[in-house]
Every structure is written in structure tokens, then in C-alpha cells.
Amino acid sequence: MRLVAIVACLMVMTADAAAEQRYALVISGASGGQKYAEQMAEWRNGIRAALVDRYGFSPDDVRIFVDETVKTGGEQGTAQNVRAAIATLSKRLTKDDVLFIVLLGHGTYDGEAAKFNLVGPDLTAADWGTLLNGLPARLVMVNTTAASFPFLEPLSGPNRIVITATDSAAQKYATVFPDYFVKAMNEASTDLDKNGRTSIFEVFAAASLAVKQHYEKRGQLLTERALFDDNGDRVGREADATGPDGALARTLYLDAELPAAADNPELAALIQRRRELEAEAEAMKAKKASMPGPLWEAEYEKLMLELARVSREIKAKS
């Protein structure tokens, strides 16, 4: 009962607004026709609206890359423009920042290399791995295309959340995942634990469930299973699967923490400590089935008490 009370208290105390800077690249490539161009425009607009209006991203830090049919409202989704944007960000990003990248459109796999189809020359999964290598920020990479699965392994790494719309390189048909991912970003019900914030995992889980329901309602075989990896082991898992993933994705939120921490090193250190404790708590949850009940509860309660103490300090200093 005591542990329940501690957790309930923490849910209130950690529902504060991030000291980090948050950046987003929303990238559309070649449209493949007017139907897809209109669909991608809807997704881009939905993501931008969610990031800026719902989660408080600065409009200047959300860069939109459009397909070849669009003449205004964004930069062309070319390899050159994408490379330039990432090069610019690499000079600004710090280890505390968040970079959120979403790929919208089409992908291909020829048996050797998976590609995201851009306007002009494409970028392979290996190209993306090279582009993002060495970035200090926490990275969220969401590839919503059919040929997204082969992107998971080369992009996996520490402080990275990689999401793919499919679990097989053989998937060739257009995915419904991006539609439900965008909807999940915009819906209050996505906050599954009701702590007032929306984590990457919550968006992923909500979108994954909606995809399954999409196929079930139509009496169709489920042909796409979204995966995520957030522990750098290069192994993707579905949202409802057990395993070591989840600690980072459950504690990396789309909305911001405390802006005041930017000018307060002590507060920033406390927020960093809270992140670490939250990640430890998620890791402890994964160990519950493999530990004796009393031992697990004792260790988890100790962790929750420390998290409560740090959260109280953050609240007092903010």
C-alpha cells in the first residue's frame, strides 16, 4: 500500500513541463502519385501541429521536407537537403537535446539495401546510419515505410529509439502505420498512464494497437507489425512483447520538461538524475518476473523513494 502511495505521488510530481532543446525533421520523399502526395501532406501537417501546438516545439525547430509536387511550405525532400539539415543540427545538438525524425512516404528493398525514397537520389539504411553517427542528442527515428525493417539494425544504438512500421524486409505494400502514428500524436487518450505527459512508447503502443484493429475490423490478415528498439541491442520488439526494451521510450516525452533548468545547472542536474531513476524504474519492472517478490518490492520501493525525493527537489527549485 505504501508503494502504491509513493507511485501515485510521483505521477503528480513528475508531470512538470524539458530543459533540453527539441528538434524535429519531418521528411517526405518522392510521392509516387497525387493520391500519396495528398496523404503525405496530411501526415506532415498532423505531425507539425502535434509537435508545435500540443507538445510545445518551437516552430523554427521543426523542419518540414516535402515531396516533388509541393512548391511552397517546406524544403524539397532531397538527399542534399537532408544531409545539410543534419550537418547543421550536428553543430547545435548537445547530449541533453532530443532529435525527432519521421520518414513519410515510400521505401524499397532489393535484397541487399533498403532505401527511403527521396526526391532524386535515395538514401539507404547504411547512409542514414552514417549521417546520424556521432550525434550527441537523444535520437528518435521513426521510419513509417514498407521497407523500414532493415533500418532498425544500422540505426540502433545508445540513447536511441528506433521505430519501424514493419518487422520484415519482405513487406512491400504501403503501410497504414503512419496514419495511426500521426493520430496517436494528436490524441489525449495516448497518455496511457495518465501522468499528464506523452512518451514515445505511448505513441508507438497506441499506433501499433490501432494498426492491429484496422486489419481485424476488415477481416484481413495482419501484414504489418511495427517494432521498436531503445536499448541498442539491434533487436526490435512489438509494443506488447516482453523483453529488455522500453526504459528509454517510456521516459522520453514529446512535451518539454522545465525551461528554467536551462539557466540553472543544479536544477538541470536534478532533472538528469530523475531521468536516470525513471529509466532504472522501467528496467526494474522488466526484472519483476525473475526476482523473488519481497526482494523486488524492497528494491523498487527504495528506487521510488529516491525518485520521490529528487522530484520534490525539482519542484522546490522550479
Where are these regions (language model features)?
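Caspase-like cysteine protease fold
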Residues: D191-E278
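Alpha-helical, heptad-rich or low-complexity scaffold/stalk segments
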Residues: T144, D263-N264, L270-I271, E278-A316
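Second-shell loop/turn segments in exported
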Residues: A30-E38, D67-Q76, A113-V119, A165-Q171, ...
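A short, glycine/acidic-enriched catalytic loop
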Residues: G77, L103-L135
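Active-site-proximal beta-strand/loop segments in catalytic clefts of secreted hydrolases
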Residues: I27-S31, F65-T69, V102-H106, V119-P121, ...
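Bacterial N-terminal signal peptides
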Residues: R2-T14
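Active-site-proximal C-terminal subdomain of hydrolase catalytic domains
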Residues: N45, V140-D230
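Boundary/activation segment at the start of structured domains
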Residues: D16-F100, A114-K115, A247-A256, K315-S318
